[in-house]
């Protein structure tokens, strides 16, 4: 049986949550911190009511902080699994760490532990049981609507939105109605509780469809978890869909409306000048990025389609329209202050006109202001600042 792992993320009150979880017999808390000079790993457990702690300084792997933390954590998870007195592992994340890439690494990054351990990911021995994110609502909402940047180039909103969105349990302090309305739509699969007293109870009653470390892809449903679709004051989910492509320059101008009064935008885009590529747009607060998400099925050879997820193929069959196949745009925009009508009108105006649709031979000549996007070389692990990176654009980042 695999050992359950709980990740605790957030900006505030994570110490209280890990302290509450530590009280259960058999729980080990693991924490990594980089002080600018040394990576330190700390573990804590309770034995007959006595707190037992250890602290170790780690040797840098390849001179890289991120590699050091990743390699040590993944190996440590597998070793802790073998200990008879360990029934649960709690990973206490640094404040600006995002849980999604860590869960991905647990499931996919191959590690070599040593004699007696088969090579493979940590998921051979452990499973992500839950992600707990601590949210101080008074601070969280302004951070998640803002455009402040961290030293590593990510925006504050990218982290705070990502931490909350990926949670199975949201632990709130200073809850207020607007922030709660946003969180219910941002993380509809998560349970919400106030304070730390009921954390264990909430973890025991997670929804059956909770993430538990599973990552959405650009091709999964955008409204997974059935968020509330009715507006709650200035908070609402705006849905936009289209079966004709965007003009890249007009879309580039329109996305400015997604950077003010918007918490989160996610969506698949069909750009006229990139007929083969699914473009993925994602925003958090005042930051936005676009990246390629592979080919449309209509642009694939039969041998490529055979390897595509069955759910995506079935969805494509339902919406297939000659001559464009499964090409489409589908977006969801979580607004908190922005005018939904303005957003929909701007996106509609960015679509090709009837005259432009009649001249597909011209589409490839459209100027593309979005630039060349690529994966950061260490996209699944923290960079030198000790944080995790995602897709990053060398030319266009808003």
UniProtKB/Swiss-Prot annotation:
Quickly give the catalysed reaction. Answer: GTP + H2O = GDP + phosphate + H(+)
EC id: 3.6.5.-
Does the keyword Transmembrane helix belong to this entry? no
SMART domains linked: CobW_C
> Where is the motif (CXCC motif)?
64-67
What is a GO molecular function of this protein? Answer: GTP binding
What's the name of the protein? Zinc chaperone Rv0106
The UniProt function text for this chain reads: Zinc chaperone that directly transfers zinc cofactor to target proteins, thereby activating them. Zinc is transferred from the CXCC motif in the GTPase domain to the zinc binding site in target proteins in a process requiring GTP hydrolysis.
Give the family from UniProt: Belongs to the SIMIBI class G3E GTPase family. ZNG1 subfamily.
One Pfam entry name? cobW
User: What keywords tag this UniProt record?
Assistant: Chaperone, GTP-binding, Hydrolase, Nucleotide-binding
PANTHER family hit by this protein: COBW DOMAIN-CONTAINING PROTEIN DDB_G0274527, ZINC-REGULATED GTPASE METALLOPROTEIN ACTIVATOR 1
Database matches in SUPFAM superfamilies: Hypothetical protein YjiA, C-terminal domain
Q: Which residues bind GTP?
A: 10-14, 67-71
């Amino acid at each position: 049986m695999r050992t359950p792992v709980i990740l605790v993320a957030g900006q505030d009150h994570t110490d209280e949550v890990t302290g509450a979880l530590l009280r259960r017999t058999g729980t080990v808390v693991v924490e990594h911190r980089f002080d600018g000079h040394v990576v330190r790993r700390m573990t804590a457990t309770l034995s007959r009511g006595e707190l037992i702690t250890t602290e170790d300084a780690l040797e840098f792997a390849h001179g890289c902080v991120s590699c050091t933390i990743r390699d040590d954590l993944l190996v440590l998870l597998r070793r802790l699994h073998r200990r008879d007195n360990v029934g649960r592992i709690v990973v206490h994340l640094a404040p600006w760490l995002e849980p999604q890439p860590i869960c991905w690494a647990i499931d996919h990054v191959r590690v070599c532990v040593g004699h007696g351990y088969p090579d493979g990911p940590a998921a051979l021995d452990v499973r992500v049981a839950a992600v707990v994110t601590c949210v101080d609502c008074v601070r969280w909402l302004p951070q998640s609507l803002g455009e402040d940047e961290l030293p590593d180039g990510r925006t504050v909103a990218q982290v705070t939105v990502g931490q909350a969105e990926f949670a199975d349990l949201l632990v709130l302090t200073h809850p207020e109605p607007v922030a709660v309305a946003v969180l219910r739509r941002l993380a509809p699969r998560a349970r919400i509780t106030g304070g730390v007293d009921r954390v264990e109870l909430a973890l025991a009653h997670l929804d059956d469809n909770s993430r538990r470390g599973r990552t959405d892809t650009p091709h999964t449903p955008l409204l997974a978890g059935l968020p509330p679709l009715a507006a709650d004051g200035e908070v609402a989910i705006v849905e936009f869909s289209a079966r004709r492509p965007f003009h890249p320059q007009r879309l580039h101008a329109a996305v400015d409306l997604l950077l003010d009064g918007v918490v989160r935008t996610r969506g698949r885009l069909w750009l006229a000048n990139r007929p083969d590529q699914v473009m993925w747009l994602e925003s958090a607060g005042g930051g936005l990025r676009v990246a390629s998400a592979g080919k449309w099925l209509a642009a694939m050879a039969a041998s490529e389609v055979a390897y595509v997820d069955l759910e995506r193929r079935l969805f494509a069959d339902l919406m297939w329209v000659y001559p464009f196949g499964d090409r489409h745009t589908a977006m969801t925009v979580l607004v908190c202050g922005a005018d939904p009508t303005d957003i929909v009108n701007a996106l509609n105006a960015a679509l090709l006109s009837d005259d432009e649709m009649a001249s597909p031979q011209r589409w490839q000549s459209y100027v593309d202001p979005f630039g060349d996007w690529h994966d950061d070389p260490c996209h699944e692990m923290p960079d030198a600042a000790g944080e995790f990176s995602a897709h990053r654009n060398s030319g266009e980042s808003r």
